[in-house]
Amino acid sequence: MKQSIRDKLELLTHRLAELDRELSSGDAVRDMDGFRSLGRERAEIEPVVALYGAYRQAEADCESARAMLADAEMRELAESELETGAVRLQALEAELQCALLPCDPSDERNLFLEVRAGTGGDEASLFAGDLLRMYTRYAERQRWKVEIVSSSPSDLGGYKEVILRIAGAGAYSKLKFESGGHRVQRIPVTETQGRIHTSACTVAVMPEADEVEAVNINPADLRIDTFRASGAGGQHINKTDSAVRITHLPTGIVVECQDDRSQHRNRAQAMSVLAARIQDRQLREQQAREAATRKSLVGSGDRSERIRTYNYPQGRVTDHRINLTLYKLDAVMQGDLDELVDALTREHQADQLAALGGG
């Protein structure tokens, strides 16, 4: 085990002893918020310290076995115990490294997923619709709840822009690496000469704020406009100004919601999306500062970065961040994203482990 990792584990062991002393003192319960905070910290640390205790016991067992090697009668038993002990040490070290990885506080949150058509005109809008179906089907496989918060349909049946809210256990942890540029190479339905075109969409994945109030938004910084929702018409065509557009003046972020017939619900949804976008911008600014000292390949979330290509003639999907190519395009577009999600998660963890070992 690297000394830097052992040092971190020793610090956690001492911290657990400190927490036990503080929590058992009579003064602790006088401040219930502080008491709960100490309890949460202890709950996070205790399993790691217990693992480290098991690791140190395995080290001690190996030392005892090593000492028996000098005894001819005990040598065979000692060699067997050393072999078993080495396997156990390796397994415990891997567990400890994973336990020490920094936890993303947003991993268990619900999320907003935005798909915007980029270069490619109508074809880009159609691809935005394909991505919407891909993510919706993936979410359904995970038994997550999906709802369209806002949409701007295109003439041919795709979307210029669409925002999904996805709610479910671990939703953000699995989809957070989808932010970036998604490129498609295929023959468009509007193409008469059979030529392959390249189009692009941008995907943004943002954790939902626990509470809109948790994001510091000054009401004086908002311009709120209401207007009549646009649509294809029919018996439920909107006769009132139920659509809502909120502009956050300091950042220029604009959110429109018109999918509900209630202005109140549209406004609440727009505020939720606005809070998530502001929080997301703050997070990306922080990540950009951190990236100046350490480049994180998978987790950069740079929206201008081309992260994936979907090549229809070859039936392949390539994720450029991890050089992974899968020849299962049809399955991926039907929501079979597990192989991509798992590979991206492993790469991110390897990146974190490298930083941990160097710390």
Swiss-Prot record:
Gene Ontology molecular function: translation release factor activity, codon specific
Grouped into one coarse class, the protein's main location is cytoplasm
Residues the record lists as N5-methylglutamine modifications: 235
Q: Keyword Cytoplasm: yes or no?
A: yes
Q: Where found?
A: Cytoplasm
**What GO cellular-component annotations does this UniProt entry give?**
cytoplasm
**What UniProt keywords are attached to this protein's entry?**
Cytoplasm, Methylation, Protein biosynthesis
Q: How is it modified after translation?
A: Methylated by PrmC. Methylation increases the termination efficiency of RF1.
- A Pfam family that this protein carries is RF-1
Q: Which HAMAP family match?
A: Rel_fac_1
NCBIfam families (alphabetical): prfA (TIGR00019), PRK00591.1 (NF001859)
Please give the function described in this protein's UniProt entry.
Peptide chain release factor 1 directs the termination of translation in response to the peptide chain termination codons UAG and UAA.
Q: Please state which protein family the record places this protein in.
A: Belongs to the prokaryotic/mitochondrial release factor family.
PANTHER family named in the record: LD18447P
User: Could you tell me what this protein is called?
Assistant: Peptide chain release factor 1
Q: Which organism is it from?
A: Aromatoleum aromaticum (strain DSM 19018 / LMG 30748 / EbN1) (Azoarcus sp. (strain EbN1))
Upper lineage ranks? Answer: Bacteria, Pseudomonadati, Pseudomonadota, Betaproteobacteria, Rhodocyclales
